């Protein structure tokens, strides 16, 4: 099935409201607790046109050319109504524009299209995500959102699957959705009001966490050579702290908690003892795996090392894991993404495309 393409639309018809959304998108993208690397997406509806973030773009660079893709809302709705709908069918709903040059829309474009509000903002809010990662933490999430019209959405694959899940759950009054292991979706017909809602949610979530600003542990002096192994030492002491705390190392080696962590870092973060026999050979072998596998390694008690060919955004995603670990109590079991979910993400053409958009060699 191929969705009908609408008539071409000129970039000159972009409304002032879209420019305001781009400014807000950049603001969100510069807040690492809301957005990490190429994650998150925003949109605005103008008539039957949906302007949605292009796949692989960074919200922190929302003022750059071809950040938004124009799409036909009616074509997306027609495509989604068919059980046979695929990602390619959604891509066919792009309104032709000679300046786009094969740019793809965010995989979340269907979700943006089926939500009736003019503006839709989807962030990977780490505080919201943290409170979805354990049954013991869900009461804190419910307390934070008390009095708001909101929906909790159990984890489901991003894209068409998430879109259909929201279709089955939502009603017209729902403006806030909390996605398990994934983030926030906030809707509104007025951008100023949406921003106020986002600010209110931020304060509500902040109230559920104890404020503690601690200096990161300083990694030990690295008196071993990893030159030629395909890895380089990380200079960020916050990131290095992930390798210094046994509980954090164990959690990272068990699996991943967020879809984008899988896409940029692989299924888990391996731990390696720098004093074990064959240490350099082991690193060389690990660095030969297809990306994003083994993008970073925990050197036990010494810090993190990052692959020389790692994707753009790798360091941002590792810092995201530090922020998550810092918020999570040590005594709670975590809801990791299972192997089927991980393989689905790693083998998904839409995510492979996003990875290609974030190769340093480009």
Regions found by a protein language model. Name each.
Residues 1-362:
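Glycine-rich flexible loops
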């Amino acid at each position: 099935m191929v969705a009908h393409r609408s008539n071409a639309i000129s970039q000159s018809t972009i409304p002032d409201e879209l420019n305001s959304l781009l400014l807000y998108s950049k603001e969100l993208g510069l807040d690492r607790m809301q957005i990490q690397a190429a994650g998150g997406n925003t949109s605005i509806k103008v008539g039957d046109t949906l302007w949605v973030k292009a796949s692989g773009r960074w919200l922190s660079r929302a003022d750059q050319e071809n950040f938004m893709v124009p799409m036909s809302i009616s074509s997306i709705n027609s495509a989604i109504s068919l059980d046979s709908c695929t990602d390619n069918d959604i891509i066919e709903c792009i309104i032709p524009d000679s300046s786009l040059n094969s740019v793809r829309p965010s995989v979340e474009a269907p979700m943006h299209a089926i939500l009736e509000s003019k503006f839709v903002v989807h962030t990977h809010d780490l505080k919201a995500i943290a409170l979805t990662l354990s049954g013991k933490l869900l009461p804190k999430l419910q307390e934070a959102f008390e009095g708001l019209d909101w929906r909790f959405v159990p984890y489901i694959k991003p894209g068409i699957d998430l879109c259909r899940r929201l279709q089955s759950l939502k009603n017209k009054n729902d403006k806030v959705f909390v996605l398990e292991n994934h983030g926030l979706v906030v809707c509104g017909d007025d951008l100023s009001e949406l921003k106020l809602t986002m600010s209110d949610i931020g304060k509500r979530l902040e109230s559920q966490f104890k404020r503690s600003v601690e200096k990161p542990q300083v990694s030990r002096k690295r008196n071993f050579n990893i030159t030629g192994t395909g890895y380089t030492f990380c200079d960020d002491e916050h990131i290095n702290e992930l390798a210094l705390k046994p509980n954090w190392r164990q959690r990272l080696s068990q699996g991943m908690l967020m879809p984008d962590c899988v896409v940029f870092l692989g299924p888990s973060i391996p731990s390696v003892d720098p004093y074990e026999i064959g240490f350099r050979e082991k690193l060389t072998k690990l660095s030969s795996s297809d990306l994003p596998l083994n993008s970073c390694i925990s050197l036990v008690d010494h810090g993190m090392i990052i692959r020389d060919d790692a994707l753009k955004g790798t360091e941002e995603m590792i810092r995201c894991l530090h922020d998550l670990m810092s918020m999570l109590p040590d005594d709670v079991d975590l809801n990791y993404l299972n192997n089927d979910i991980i393989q689905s993400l790693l083998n998904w053409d839409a995510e492979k495309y996003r990875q290609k958009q974030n190769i340093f060699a480009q």
